[in-house]
Amino acid sequence: MDGNDINIQKNEFSRDQSALLMMDQHSDHKNHESAIGEPGMSYTASQPALSSTEHQTPLVSEASVAAPQNHLNGNSHESVSEMDRNSVDFAIESVLMKARAYNKMGAPKDPRRKQHNPKSEPKIEPHVTDSSDNQAAMSNKMEAEAPKMESNQNYVSNGSEPPFRFVSISNFDEMKTKKKEVQEELKLEVDSDSEEDDVPEQKTPKESDRCGGCGKFTHEDDLIALEEEKKKEKEKPLMSKKKSHHHKKNDFQWIGCDSCQTWYHFLCSGLEQFEYYLYEKFFCPKCVPHTGHSIRYKVVAPHRYRWYSPNEKHLGIEVGSKTWIEDFITRENTVPSPTDDEVCIVEDGYEFRREFEKLGGADNWGKVFMVKDMDGLNMTMPKPGFDLEDVVKIMGSDYEVDTIDVYNQSTYSMKLDTFRKLFRDTKNRPLLYNFLSLEFSDNNEMKEIAKPPRFVQEISMVNRLWPDVSGAEYIKLLQREEYLPEDQRPKVEQFCLAGMAGSYTDFHVDFGGSSVYYHILKGEKIFYIAAPTEQNFAAYQAHETSPDTTTWFGDIANGAVKRVVIKEGQTLLIPAGWIHAVLTPVDSLVFGGNFLHLGNLEMQMRVYHLENAIRKEIRSEEKFYFPNFELLHWMYMRNVLLEKITEANQEGSDMREQEKNIWTASQIMKAEMERWMDRELRLGPEKNAILPTDDKNKIMISVRKQIEIQTKIQNAKNKPMGLKQKRKSRESAERDDEDYCPSSSTAYKKKYTKKAKKDNDDAPKVKKAKKEEVPEEKVPVPEAAGPSEVTAPLTIKIGMGPTEDQKGVVQIFNNQCTSSGRKVKLNQNVADYCGSHLEARVEEIPEKATKSFRELDNELERCEAVHSGEKIKKVKEPKPPKQPKEKKEKPPPKKKEMSSRDRLMKKLKM
């Protein structure tokens, strides 16, 4: 075995770790065959060569060994060139040399260390026993070797270099603490389930090597270029419901041609992302003509995600692997069918609308619907004959889409045309692929071919904030300056999905608790669904955060999972929160989408909390979330809900009576936004936040104010009738009560009132509005023939027409509307005054207008302010501008006619 093939590059320890491991070396530094480790723990210094079916391990060049040696002032105890490179001594000596370099000069500036990826290196497996005997033995050993440690200082005084050096630690307790910390780090590394286990292990070229494709970047420059690229571009969320890897990191890793030994970046090698880990032997495009295509790994563990690893042959069967899917297909029909309370099956869209409204509509949507015929849904779908080739033609053959490697249960990027070729090759399918996230709303042709149902467009929160640019709603938003940039729109309502027969997508909840419409254009799908109960959510969270990949969620859900089969031409409508997995029994092409709406707002927030809890526990930043979820709710509150509440407050109306769903959603959203605001004030704004904190604070101030006003209106309606109205009828009650005796205070008030009236006889009298009096006509009753009897007179009420004043009031209030077009809510006094005439809404125009329109508007604003409790703003009416007076031109002075006398006088003067 060549020395460059020794797997030592990946076993780099930190400064403290290296020194602590060397403390347990044998005291005789000439004997390099002593073991590395401590009592109760054993380490493997060098790994055996990998099998041909495993990934190629990173190589270490002579330059990497010599780099730290150049920093040493003295000669090393034993030269590396004199050692046998095939022995374990070479690995030990390399670690010792690096430790000497760390202790003497600090960390060497080796560019290769910058690209070191600890997740991709083989784990060091410590075998630790927690017995107190081992701890005591370790302590005794360190105390016994203390003189030997001090003796190493003689090398420095003599000018020679010891074979290894030690970290300066003040006492043995600190040393034991340090060693325990290293031990815990190693434990953590073994127990952690890395997301990048299936990423190909990085090969390391020499410093002089350059990429055979681009020829621009050395190994050090790759990461610099990658970091600059990250700063320029914001990382977009991967459109996948499954976890995914850091593909961009892999793009700049190396792969070497096994024929010409030329190094390439993965990005420049001609491979697509889904191929990065597939090949045992890679041949570059230049060598393919005479070597043939690259050779794939053999399948040695089909029951595992890492099916190419012989080390996993004896491990358990993972859910979603080839073996598991083949076995699951044979027994999946034993999953029970749903009840009528869980799934409602209807014939067409018309029946769906009837059942949907009967159950409460979107505000009370909690049941799954399966519609056999799309007729009546007002949904646009491609015509018969449309297939995957048409999708590739419209979107472009080089269009990249995130594709799930089914047997690996991971997401990679793949070109559409590549997927089409694999999809059509039904005989040769060593691996299965399906894509769930081809979002096509940016493609003008594709978005017209497939559109969601009409009711989805009507209730969608996204569609309300970002309407179609060709519609009237878009123009209204522009006029009101409420239009939001298109690049902030969550594009999740129009998806194309395609999957190979046998594909399986594991259990998940659609991002953000969004609801789903799902139409099978070709093929068939089988859904396994579980209702959104707290018990199922708890089981799902435990399942997602568990490192165990061998347990199917349906086995731990206690019979909650039900089976629903959807055939070609049928549509499935799933409300928020339903947990589901999907099996594709035949090749399928599907159109669907996700949407948020106010009716499921509470469940959507519950799922959002569940997602955050799972992400926090597994520390995964790659799970797919609803794009701009919080921004969407901030904008919806500002542009929609706040307007509705303000309008109701101005009218003095109770939202519980007319718009109960708006009021309920506003309260839920306000409580959630308070939490978001509190988090932002404590932890600071999130990275790349679109809406500034100040703007959010302004929205919250307005929301609190308007909700407080609406609450006062509702509380006022809940109170019993006030005392003022009862006091009005007190005098009549007193008159009716014969035994009533007024108190002295009451008598004094009456006396004082009469006296005041007499004193103010000279004051101008104001006529009071008389109540409508109905004349009573007495009808005589004929006397009976018998003895006379006293009978009460019979009264008949005759209805009179409205007076002129009543007609005027009716006309005014019939014509008054708010800005939204609603009828103005009438004052009770006005209703009492007009009586039944106002209810009849007599459409008569008064002969003479009592007030101008400006006065009526002012009166209406005053009434609304009184009902809402706001202060009345007195606004002076602007005086009409004075028109400049026209200047009259003076006529030219008339010449005075001279008489004969005047002429004579003139001559005499001369």
From Swiss-Prot:
Textual note on the cofactor: Binds 1 Fe(2+) ion per subunit.
Activation and inhibition: Competitively inhibited by 2-hydroxyglutarate.
Disruption phenotype annotation: Impaired locomotion. While wild-type animals move by alternating dorsal and ventral flexions along the body length, producing a regular sinusoidal track on bacteria, the track pattern left by mutants is irregular, with increased wavelength (distance between successive peaks of a wave) but unchanged amplitude of the wave. An increase of H3K9me2 and H3K27me2 levels is observed. RNAi-mediated knockdown suppresses mitochondrial stress-mediated longevity.
UniProt entry keywords in alphabetical sequence: Chromatin regulator, Dioxygenase, Iron, Metal-binding, Nucleus, Oxidoreductase, Transcription, Transcription regulation, Zinc, Zinc-finger
Outcome after substituting F495A: Strongly impairs histone methyltransferase activity
Residue stretches making up the JmjC domain: 441-612
Positions of substrate binding: T505, D506, F507, H508, V509, D510, Y518, K525, H580
Function noted in UniProt: Histone demethylase required for nervous system development. Specifically demethylates dimethylated 'Lys-9', 'Lys-23' and 'Lys-27' (H3K9me2, H3K23me2 and H3K27me2, respectively) of histone H3, thereby playing a central role in histone code. Promotes mitochondrial stress-induced longevity.
Domain notes: The PHD-type zinc finger mediates binding to H3K4me3.
UniProt protein name: Lysine-specific demethylase 7 homolog
Species assigned in the record: Caenorhabditis elegans
Lineage: Eukaryota, Metazoa, Ecdysozoa, Nematoda, Chromadorea
